[in-house]
Design a protein with these regions (language model features):
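Iron-sulfur cluster-binding cysteine motifs and their immediate structural context
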Residues: 1-8, 40-58, 69-86, 145-156
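Short, structured motif recognition centered on aromatic/hydrophobic residues
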Residues: 79, 112-114, 134-137, 147-148
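Polybasic, low-complexity binding patches
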Residues: 3-18, 62, 85-98, 159-164
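Short histidine
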Residues: 12, 143-169
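Ferredoxin-type iron-sulfur electron-transfer modules and their immediate structural context
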Residues: 1-44, 48, 95, 107-110
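Intrinsic, low-complexity N-terminal interaction/targeting segments
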Residues: 101-126
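Short Cys/His-rich zinc-binding micro-motifs
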Residues: 37-39, 136-142
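Short linker/helix segments within small regulatory modules
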Residues: 57-68, 131
Length: 169
């Protein structure tokens, strides 16, 4: 994909834990941590009401359950929902895997989705925070590399790979 992109390999993300720069949103029984330096363009957090509003309304069982679901399936891990009673984050059990994210709504190619705690290391040996969910920049334009910040939408990044429905078996 980098043959088709104006790729700048400079890593720009600070090696700061995700939660350190997160904004906190309180709801009854839960607290949402949101680090806006990371991509939100997958829109899983907006599937059935926004996760921010669902957190605020989480005294309603359906809103609570949707807030849990929407936050856990944020590919970048930008959103983390804290259960105040259990004193732990809701986090899906993901096996180590890689995936490519495509954005048909914005008609662009998105980041590399890294799941299941696969370590991310820089070329000089820098070890980034190991997380269950993270998205890595493929377009070369993120201001938070190696992480995706959603700039692929602005630059209309195209990886020119066939969609899965077009792949030959």
């Amino acid at each position: 994909s980098h043959h088709h992109a104006d790729w700048d390999p400079t890593l720009t993300a600070g090696n700061i834990p995700l939660l350190e720069n997160a904004d906190l949103y309180d709801g009854p029984g839960v607290q949402l941590a949101d680090n806006t330096e990371y991509c939100v363009h997958a829109r899983f957090c907006m599937a059935r009401g926004t996760v921010w509003q669902l957190t605020e309304d989480s005294d309603n069982t359906e809103a609570h359950d949707l807030a849990v679901h929407e936050s856990m399936y944020c590919p970048s891990g930008r959103l983390k929902l804290w259960d105040k009673e259990e004193e732990k984050f809701y986090e899906p059990p993901l096996k180590p895997a890689l995936g490519l994210i495509e954005d048909p709504q914005e008609e662009c190619s998105g980041p590399l989705w890294v799941k299941g705690g696969i370590p991310v290391n820089g070329p000089n040996g820098t070890e980034y925070e190991q997380r269950n969910r993270v998205t890595l920049c493929r377009c070369g334009a993120s201001a938070n590399k190696p992480y995706c910040d959603g700039t692929h939408v602005t630059v209309h990044f195209q990886d020119h790979l066939p969609l899965s429905t077009e792949l030959e078996e």
